[in-house]
Amino acid sequence: MAVKEPVGIIGAGLIGLATARQLAQSGVPVVVWEKEAAVARHQSGHNSGVVHAGIYYQPGSAKAKNCRRGVELLRAYCAARGLPWDERGKLVVARDEIETQRLREIERRSQANGVPGVRWLDGPDIRALEPDVAGVSALLSPTTAIADFPAIARAYAADVTAAGGQIRMNSPVTAVRRHGDGVQVVTRGGTHTVSHLVICAGLQTDLLARAAGDEVAPEIVPFRGEYLRLRPEVRHKVHHLIYPVPDPAYPFLGVHLTPRIDGEADLGPNAVLALAREGYRWRDVSPRQLSRLARSTAFRRLAGQNWRAGLREMHGSVSRRAFLAEARTYLPWLEAGHVAAAPAGVRAQAVDPDGSLVDDFRIHRIGPVTAVRNAPSPAATASMAIAEQIVTELSPSNLRA
C-alpha cells in the first residue's frame, strides 16, 4: 500500500538537508531519501571547504543573491552550533595585464554584490601580505572563509530528525512518476506518494527530473576535480586562500591553493571529464554513462567547442609536472616534492543543448516537482539561502500535513 508523505526530498547533500531542515522546523512532515549510507557523500563532501564571499558572480544573478544571503545565514548557523569557521581571506592574483583587466571586472562585481572589505593590491602590497606569492595585482577578499561542510551537513541532518523529519539512508530511488496531483517515489522500501517532491540529487538530478516530467535540458556532464595536497613542511608558506583570475569562458575558478579547516592545504582542482557519474578515479568507467555522452548532442557540441581546453586538463591530470606548472605562475617556489595526491571530487556540470556550460543556479518547477538542475559552487555556501527559496516557492497546499 502506498504511504502518504506531504513533502519528499531526494538527496541528503547540503541543499537537500537544508531544505528538509527548514520544512521540518516549520512543522511540515518531510522525508529524505538518500542512496548512500551517510549524508554528504558526493559533491557536498568532496569540495574545497571554501565559504565564498560572492565576489565573482554577475550582479543580480541567482548565484550573487544566494551567496550573499547564504554566507550570512551559514556564519550565524556555524556560530550557534559551534562548528568550525576560519575567516582566512582570499587573494585573487593577476599574473599579467590581461588578467589585471579581468580583475577590475571582478572588483566591480564584488562592489555591486555588496561584498565587505574587498580591496585592490598592487605587486608590493601582495608581497607584504604574502611574500611567497607572485603577481602584478590582486584583490583581497578578507571575509572569504573555510569551513567543514560534511560537519555542517551532519548538523543539518540532526536538525531534521530533531524536528520530526525522516532521513532514510541506503534508499536509492528507482522510479519517479507523476500520480494525480502528487508524485510517486519508488524505493526498495516501497512506493511513497508525496504532495511535492524536491529533487536535490546532484550528479543524478537530470535523470530523476526527466522521470518526474521535466524537460531533458540541461544535461549533467560529470567533471572530476583532482587535487594535490601540500606536504607539512611547506603548508606555512601561504596563509590566505590563493586563486588565479578565472578565464571568463569557463565556469571554473582555476587551480588554486586552499588551506583546509583540518590544517591541510590543497592545490586544485582541475576539471577533467569523468567517465562515470561518480567517477572519482580514471579507472571508474561506466559504459552506460559513456553511451549517454555519445548520444548527447549537447555533449558533442561542448566537446567540439572546448576540445583544446579538454586536452589541456587531461594533460594536467596525467602529468603532475603539467598540473604544477599552472600553479607555479603565482607560487614560483612550488616543486614536485612539495605535494602528494589528495582525494578528488566530481562536479555535476549542467550543459545546455547548444553545448554551453550553465553558469548560474537553475531550479525548475514542474507542478508538484521542484528540481535543482544546476547547483555548482557556491551552492555549499548558499545552501540555506537556496533552501529558503525552494520552501518559499512551495504553495501552502503542498505543505499540508
Model-derived regions: residue spans:
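N-terminal Rossmann-like FAD-binding beta1-loop-alpha1 element of flavoenzymes
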Residues: E5-V32
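C-terminal catalytic lobe of FAD-dependent flavoproteins
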Residues: T297, L302-A401
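Dinucleotide-binding Rossmann-like beta1-alpha1 core, especially the glycine-rich loop
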Residues: G49-D125, G135, G254-V255, E264-D266, ...
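Conserved Rossmann-like nucleotide-cofactor binding loop
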Residues: I15, A38, Q204
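Helical element adjacent to the flavin cofactor pocket in flavoenzyme catalytic cores
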Residues: L139-H196, L207, M384-E393
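Short beta-strand to alpha-helix junction loop
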Residues: P59-R69, V93-R102, L140-D159, R168, ...
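Flavin-dependent oxidoreductases
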Residues: A18, V176-V285
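Glycine-rich FAD pyrophosphate-binding loop
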Residues: A24-H46
